[in-house]
Regions:
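DNA polymerase processivity clamps
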Residues: 1-190
Length: 190
């Protein structure tokens, strides 16, 4: 995949981490060039135009191995995910968990997912196993991504896979509210 200037700039922002100089660039492991901020990992077959760094001793390529029992999830559009981020802003939350898979109860930081979709635009599928295992992203090319899931408590706000704002502990009646951001569904006690 030939990387655009915008994708390279986004990767430069990811590898700019003053707390971890060993990740301020890309490094080679196995057949892949890897860029990471320790919350998301990007795997490239061809070396991006970024400086080389020390990297880490942990084998990050092993994270791409998924068991046969893993669930494959078709990803929503990037526009949908940007909308999820906007809902988090409307709720005055920096991070609002997005329910990537309701059956497996896997939640993800929507900001990291949008970033993954922008850096790897051909990514169409996520593979997950449990709420605590890394989520692997792949598409049509030879590049991959991994995002570590969010731990989500059963009683806190989240956005479900249909884009609805859910507040599980406040009852069951759903009321539509209009605000300056957009129409948001919330759950209120009865």
């Amino acid at each position: 995949m030939k990387m655009t200037g915008a994708q390279t700039q986004m990767l430069k922002g990811i590898i700019t981490n003053p707390d971890h100089p060993e990740f301020q660039g890309i490094f080679k492991q196995g057949d892949f060039w890897i860029a990471t901020d320790r919350m998301s990992i990007f795997y490239f077959k061809k070396k991006p135009n970024l400086p080389i760094c020390q990297g880490c001793d942990q084998n990050l390529v092993d994270l791409l191995d998924t068991p046969l029992s893993a669930r494959e999830i078709k990803l929503p559009s990037i526009d949908f995910m940007v909308g999820v981020q906007n809902k988090a802003s409307c709720e005055r939350k920096h991070i609002l968990p997005y329910e990537l898979d309701a059956k497996a109860k896997v939640f993800i930081n929507s900001k990291f997912m949008v970033r993954m979709m922008k850096v790897l635009p051909d990514v169409t599928v996520a593979i997950c196993t449990t709420p605590k295992k890394p989520i692997v992203f792949h598409g049509f090319g030879d590049d991959y991504g991994v995002i570590f899931p969010m731990i989500h408590s059963d009683n806190s706000l989240y956005i479900n896979h249909e884009g609805e704002l859910i507040s599980p502990n406040l009852g069951e009646e759903i009321i539509k509210e209009e605000d300056e951001c957009n129409s948001i569904e919330t759950v209120t006690s009865m």
